[in-house]
């Protein structure tokens, strides 16, 4: 039974990607738990810039493969060690183990994807490199066993609401 559950947890289904640079797609399966305007993350030097942020909580039953919300170039990847609070809590963004991907989209906008480890998830896997060119929906990594993904973006308007279910690579998060 454990073997079946592990196989289910680490599944990596193919997804139908829109492939339209005027939209951002969800980087993760899960529930939208926040849609807000915030300062950019200081970890990637954008704390003096305003962004919209969407947070997606992945429970242990969601697929944990993460994808890029847009086509573009990975300008930076930054790993921050940290604690392992429940990923749905606000303090998880600042205190939990996390990995930042700073992506320059095809329109020249900064898009930041943050993988945040949670109470059970204690391993972030990065499958991309700095300066790598990505297509919308490409796999960038995974977080094992329950976690969160935050997307910071500029110059797009949100299309999702808190409580909505998101599917990685398919759900349209925001529109140009």
Model-identified regions with their sequence ranges:
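Contiguous, well-folded functional domains in the mature portion of proteins
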Residues: 1-176
């Amino acid at each position: 039974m454990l073997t079946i559950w592990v196989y289910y947890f680490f599944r990596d289904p193919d997804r139908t990607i829109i492939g339209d640079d005027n939209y951002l797609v969800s980087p993760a399966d899960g529930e939208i738990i926040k849609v807000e305007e915030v300062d950019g993350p200081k970890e990637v030097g954008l704390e003096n810039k305003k962004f919209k942020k969407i947070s997606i909580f992945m429970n242990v039953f969601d697929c944990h493969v993460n994808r890029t919300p847009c086509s573009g170039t990975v300008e930076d990847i930054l790993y921050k060690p940290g604690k392992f609070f429940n990923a749905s809590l606000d303090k998880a963004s600042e205190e939990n183990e996390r990995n930042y991907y700073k992506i320059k989209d095809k329109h020249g906008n900064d898009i930041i994807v943050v993988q945040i480890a949670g109470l059970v998830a204690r391993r972030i896997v990065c499958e991309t490199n700095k300066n790598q060119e990505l297509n919308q929906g490409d796999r960038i990594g995974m977080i094992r066993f329950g976690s969160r993904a935050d997307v910071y973006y500029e110059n797009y308007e949100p299309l999702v609401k808190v409580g909505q279910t998101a599917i990685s690579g398919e759900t349209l998060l925001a529109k140009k």
